[in-house]
Design a protein with these regions (language model features):
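Residue-identity detector for glycine
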Residues: 5-6, 20, 41, 53-54
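Tryptophan (W) side chains
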Residues: 11-12
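Intrinsically disordered, low-complexity polyampholyte segments enriched for Lys and acidic residues
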Residues: 15-23, 34, 48
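Active-site entrance/lid segments in N-terminal catalytic domains of soluble metabolic enzymes
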Residues: 28-30, 35, 46-319
């Protein structure tokens, strides 16, 4: 997103460190030619952040963060880590994968700190949050070795219970990450888990998430989904189904009215697409309906969901 507020260009965040439990992802904003060179492996990822000067280096937009904490997986990049990073002035990121399972299991463990019940108490439709508590909360926790109560499986046309659970649990995680401060919080989802995406994204937006990050696929429809939810409208996502083209592929949708009745407008989070190929980044940048506000570029050192090698094999002295 440009400093003027439009999505006429996308900003590039170069991921210069492998993402692991004990490190973070350090980013630098760069122009398209330099980011493209990193993606193609013809230039190393820069090791500094926001270096000023030089005709080819742009000033960071006002909303940029020097450090974007990586989404490192379910139960690792949780609300406590994201909140701690945000309190230092950087962008804390919650891993949104499987939050319905993570939150409901914590409730079944008795929610000993009371954090999730406190978050659910702030859900805008109290009786929906109470339904989740009634179904999953176990006072004192389940016995050792006892099985957890399962959550509904993902399907193309989820039940009302399933959709509401996705919204409520994502709301709770983002609420806790943002509680008590005005720092920025992002949530990381996977394009591959498409059947969950509309409902979980809406739940995060309902809690005021500031950024949505997504990779592991081609997240071309996410900007349009965010636009729809920000207006209180139904959001729809075309499913990638082998053997189907755009005209015949099924879609999954979510209507905010199914949760809130008369759904109010919501602040639209910025969208950062995670890419590891110039081809994908160029495709997403072509039209406003697919263009993200920025890219997180996973180069050869990023250690993320890097795409398979493309193009002609090139070998150098080091391999």
């Amino acid at each position: 997103m440009s400093p003027q507020g439009g999505r006429s260009r996308a900003w590039w965040f170069i991921d210069t460190e492998a993402k692991g439990v004990n490190d973070h992802s350090r980013q630098r904003i760069v122009p398209l030619p330099e980011a493209s060179a990193v993606l193609q492996g013809t230039s190393p990822a820069p090791q500094d952040s926001f270096r000023a000067g030089g005709a080819d280096v742009v000033d960071p937009p006002p909303w940029a963060h020097e450090i974007i904490q990586g989404g490192m997986g379910a139960g690792v990049s949780g609300w406590k880590l994201a909140r701690a990073v945000s309190l230092t002035g950087h962008l804390g990121v919650v891993s949104g994968l499987g939050l319905d399972v993570m939150v409901t299991r914590q409730l079944q463990r008795g929610d000993p700190t009371g954090d999730y019940r406190r978050a659910l108490a702030h859900f805008p439709i109290p009786h929906i949050a109470q339904q989740v508590i009634d179904r999953y909360f176990v006072e004192g926790g389940i016995s050792d070795g006892a099985p957890f109560r399962a959550v509904p499986q993902l399907v193309v046309h989820p039940s009302r219970e399933s959709a509401r659970l996705a919204v409520v649990t994502n709301f709770a995680e983002i609420f806790l990450a943002k509680e008590g401060h005005d720092g920025s919080i992002g949530v990381n989802y996977l394009e591959k888990t498409q059947m969950a995406t509309p409902a979980v994204v809406y739940g995060a937006m309902l809690a005021g998430v500031d950024y949505v990050l997504m990779g592991a696929g081609v997240p071309a429809e996410i900007p349009r989904l965010l636009d729809a939810f920000a207006c209180g409208s139904e959001g729809e996502l075309t499913l990638a189904v082998q053997g189907c083209d755009a005209a015949t592929a099924p879609s999954v949708s979510f209507s905010p009215e199914s949760i809130l009745g008369d759904a109010p407008p919501l602040p639209r989070p910025r969208f950062l697409a995670i890419v590891s190929s110039t081809m994908l980044a160029t495709y997403l940048s072509r039209e406003d309906r697919t263009r993200p506000d920025g890219f997180v570029v996973e180069g050869i050192t990023a250690g993320g969901h890097s795409a398979p090698p493309r193009g002609r094999l090139r070998l150098e002295a080091d391999g």
